A protein has these predicted regions:
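Terminal catalytic/cofactor-binding subdomain
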Residues: 1-169, 177, 332, 336-341, ...
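Conserved aromatic-histidine-acidic binding/catalytic patches
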Residues: 27, 109-112, 116, 184-188, ...
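Structured core elements
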Residues: 40, 101, 182-186, 321-323
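Solvent-exposed residues in well-ordered beta-strands and their adjoining turns
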Residues: 42-44, 105, 186-188, 325, ...
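Short, intrinsically disordered, mixed-charge
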Residues: 67, 126, 202-205, 209, ...
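Loop-rich catalytic cores of soluble enzymes, especially ATP-dependent carboxylate-amine ligases
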Residues: 129-130, 134-315
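Long, well-ordered mid-to-C-terminal structural blocks that present hydrophobic/aromatic surfaces
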Residues: 280-364
Length: 456
């Protein structure tokens, strides 16, 4: 989530950068689940984008949420740009085009994720409905051009907007037109981090297919099942992708630091101001060679903020962030944490998942990742269709959740949250393929019904 960190301690050594990541190590008893989801606001009348300004704008929506929740406002130059729950740790923030993001508090079970989600959606509806605002659960806006989409008043996004066209074809589409759901999970040691990172990077295309949900652009079928995932293939390859070096000997926190040091920066924040340093490396900044800050060393805040501008398919911070899934309607959202918790928080399933992926080489992993946005379940790796691998992974996740045996107050375990994925596997079609069937059938070639059927 794009919320800036504040720790102005100057950094003296590379070891401090490594230690910042290593501080994420925690005992298994303290493992938590974090879920972040984005949703696109639209006007209930006319299905248009919602501006920031005005009595029915996104700023007004955030003001209403502040009064309802009592959360701390996050302000920038007099504008409310988010909310933070000081006690629980959750937050609401804005993506560049007004996509409304809930960063959930760290919770112990997927049941709690679902409860938090339901409470959040009820609260959002209470404020949004009188303002005439609805929210869409797709991976990409289905009908609007980029030019139609408003720009949120956040300094970091202005810098990114200027920089993106220099480094890729689709960066502005990523910023302004896409939505995701992400799951954040813990690790118990450096070795545990490496194993979970490798498994989740290799299998991220499985999640992309299971959640593929962005087949429309500007009112037409775009030829992809997850155009959002395709967008990431040409956004900024210096900071995204399948990080093949993570599978090499010697992978650990230090290797991630070396990678991050050479990822081009976007900005440095000083006070309320964002200073544009786009394209310069953190390594030069660390060595006192940034022309905007001559002889000045970065702070821990600068490091934490820089790490939040790196976008591989799985991101390491003080936890691992699964980044491959499209945004989906509310009833499918808990299925993403359920999938990854079942695979990564159970040792038997984690070992079995690694057995699936450990013999794939970097070229095979990359080819699968490149094919999945267009072909979904019909993408292939070696002699297998991705559908077969996805079916196996959902089965492993189910078994992992069953062994976890975390029960809700009705005595049900977390496997029930996998039901949307099991239905997808039984149907043999991705969510995008189901939507395309509607588009070519009952929707009669219009995407407008999506604003009803896929709304929150």
């Amino acid at each position: 989530m794009a919320r800036d960190q504040i720790d102005m301690t100057p950094l003296q050594s590379r070891d401090e950068l490594v230690a910042w990541l290593a501080a994420g190590v925690k005992p298994v008893s303290e493992f938590r689940i974090g879920t972040e989801h984005e949703k696109t606001p639209f006007t209930l009348q006319g299905h248009q984008p919602v501006p920031y300004e005005g009595a029915r704008g996104i700023g007004a929506l955030l003001d209403g949420m502040k009064l309802l929740l009592g959360w701390e406002p996050i302000m920038e130059r007099g504008n409310i740009i988010g909310l933070y729950d000081v006690t629980g740790g959750g937050a609401i923030s804005l993506e560049p085009g007004g996509q409304f993001e809930l960063s959930g508090a760290p919770v112990e079970t997927v049941h709690q994720t679902q409860s938090e989600l339901m409470a959040h959606l009820a609260q959002v509806r209470e404020i949004a409905a009188p303002l005439g605002i609805g929210f869409l659960g797709l991976g990409m806006t289905p009908s609007w051009s980029r030019a139609q989409i408003p720009v949120m008043p956040k300094g970091r996004y202005k810098i990114m907007t200027n920089y993106m066209p220099k480094v890729g074809q689709y960066g502005l589409d990523m910023m302004y037109r896409t939505c995701t759901v992400q799951t954040n999970l813990d690790f118990s040691s450096e070795a545990d981090m490496v194993k979970k990172l490798r498994v989740s990077v290799a299998l991220q295309p499985i999640a992309t297919a299971l959640f593929a949900n962005s087949p429309f652009t500007e009112g037409n079928a775009n030829g992809f099942q997850s155009f959002r995932s395709e967008i990431w293939r040409d956004t900024d390859n210096a900071r995204s992708g399948m990080i093949p070096w993570a599978f090499e000997e010697g992978m650990g926190f230090e290797r991630w630091v070396d990678y991050a040091l050479d990822v081009p920066m976007y900005f440095v924040k000083r006070g309320d101001a964002y200073i544009d340093v786009a394209g310069s490396s953190f390594r030069d900044f660390f060595d006192g060679k940034n022309s905007a800050f001559p002889n000045e060393r970065p702070t821990l805040s600068d490091w934490a903020n820089h790490l939040s501008t790196i976008f591989p398919e799985v991101r390491l911070k003080r936890y691992l962030e699964m980044r491959g899934a499209d945004g989906v309607p509310w009833d499918r959202l808990p299925a993403l944490p359920a999938f990854w918790v079942g695979l990564l928080y159970d040792d038997v399933s984690l070992d079995a998942a690694w057995d699936i992926a450990k013999h794939w080489n970097a070229q095979e992993r990359q080819a699968l990742r490149d094919d999945v946005p267009r072909f979904g379940f019909k993408a292939r790796i070696r002699d297998r269709y991705l559908f077969e691998v996805a079916k196996e992974c959902v089965t492993l996740a189910h078994a992992g959740l069953r062994r976890r045996a975390r029960l809700d107050h009705f005595g049900r375990d977390e496997t029930r949250h996998l039901e949307p994925l099991q239905r997808t596997i039984e149907a043999g079609r991705t969510p995008a393929e189901e939507m395309l069937e509607k588009f070519h059938g009952p929707w009669k070639g219009s995407v407008e019904p999506a604003y009803d059927e896929y709304a929150f």
